[in-house]
């Protein structure tokens, strides 16, 4: 269902969990135990989403109250989970607008409430006005939100590996989707990928290296990037991998 203007965003921002979800008395943040949901969602299923017909219809001000005239979203965390890395991006790049895109309703509700709580806590400094979360299916509707060459950075951190061969087509990195990502990513922009599944890592590297619009950056470039250390445990999934002493597989690609 196509929604005009900022209708889709306002609906996403106004969504609340089915039960009253108290905040932590210590942190003042919403508690994840009230927002539990399955680890993954079928991206091919016919979920009911409202989405803009074109990027010009997106009402970004409903998500970024302090957005400046002409300012655009620069960073997109695709499948942002519970928003740990998204919040880190907001702290690292206060002058940039970052959006988290998450398909799971309760998880996206949590991130929206988390950001709202952080904004209240930091009302005197205006922190976290530069981050927001949107519930949508990025595999279907990404070009509805972003103009050609708009994004500087895209992040795919610990995506669903879809282990069964029959479900590989559901993986968020594939040849068709890589062309869509290239469309919304500016030349010289970066795609960051991180997973704890070696087979998925090899799949990602193979597909991106085969695509004519990407090149993998060198290890030296990756190590010099201030974002790289944050990829390992800023997200909740990454922190879990660290706790379990699991492997991390990183690959960063440049848009040609």
From Swiss-Prot:
Record-annotated disulphide pairs: none
Keyword Magnesium (UniProt): no
Region (Disordered): 1-24
Pathway entry: tRNA modification; N(7)-methylguanine-tRNA biosynthesis
Catalytic activity field: guanosine(46) in tRNA + S-adenosyl-L-methionine = N(7)-methylguanosine(46) in tRNA + S-adenosyl-L-homocysteine
GO CC term (a single one): tRNA (m7G46) methyltransferase complex
Active-site residues per Swiss-Prot or TrEMBL entry: 160
Residues that, per the record, bind S-adenosyl-L-methionine: 79, 102-103, 137-138, 157, 235-237
EC identifiers of the protein: 2.1.1.33
Enzyme class, UniProt record, top EC level: transferase
Main location: nucleus
Cross-referenced InterPro entries: SAM-dependent_MTases_sf, Trm8_euk, tRNA_(Gua-N-7)_MeTrfase_Trmb
Protein keywords: Methyltransferase, Nucleus, RNA-binding, S-adenosyl-L-methionine, Transferase, tRNA processing, tRNA-binding
Subcellular localization, as worded in the UniProt entry: Nucleus
A single GO molecular function term of this UniProt record: tRNA (guanine(46)-N7)-methyltransferase activity
Cross-referenced NCBIfam families: tRNA (guanosine(46)-N7)-methyltransferase TrmB (TIGR00091)
Similarity comment: Belongs to the class I-like SAM-binding methyltransferase superfamily. TrmB family.
Summary of the function given for this chain in its UniProt record: Catalyzes the formation of N(7)-methylguanine at position 46 (m7G46) in tRNA.
Protein name: tRNA (guanine-N(7)-)-methyltransferase
Organism: Drosophila erecta (Fruit fly)
């Amino acid at each position: 269902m196509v929604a005009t203007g900022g209708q889709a965003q306002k609906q996403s921002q106004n969504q609340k969990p089915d039960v009253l979800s108290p905040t932590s008395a210590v942190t003042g943040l919403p508690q994840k135990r009230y927002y539990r949901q399955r680890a993954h969602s079928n991206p091919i299923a016919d979920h009911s989403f409202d989405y803009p017909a074109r990027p010009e219809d997106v009402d970004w001000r409903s998500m970024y109250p302090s957005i400046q005239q002409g300012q655009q979203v620069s960073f997109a965390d695709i499948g942002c989970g519970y928003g740990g890395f998204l919040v880190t991006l907001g702290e690292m790049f206060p002058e940039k607008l970052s959006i988290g895109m998450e398909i799971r309703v309760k998880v996206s509700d949590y991130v929206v409430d988390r950001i709202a709580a952080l904004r209240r806590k930091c009302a005197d400094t205006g922190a976290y006005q530069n981050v927001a979360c949107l519930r949508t299916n990025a595999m279907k509707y990404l070009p509805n939100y972003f103009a050609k060459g708009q994004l500087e950075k895209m992040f795919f951190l610990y995506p669903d590996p879809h282990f069964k061969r029959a479900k590989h087509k559901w993986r968020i990195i594939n040849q068709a989707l890589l062309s869509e990502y290239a469309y919304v990513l500016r030349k010289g922009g970066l795609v960051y990928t991180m997973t704890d599944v070696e087979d998925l890592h090899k799949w990602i590297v193979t597909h991106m290296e085969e695509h004519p619009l990407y090149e993998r950056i060198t290890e030296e470039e990756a190590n010099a990037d201030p974002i790289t250390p944050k990829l390992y445990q800023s997200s909740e999934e990454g922190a879990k991998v660290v706790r379990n002493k699991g492997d991390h597989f990183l690959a960063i690609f440049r848009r040609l």
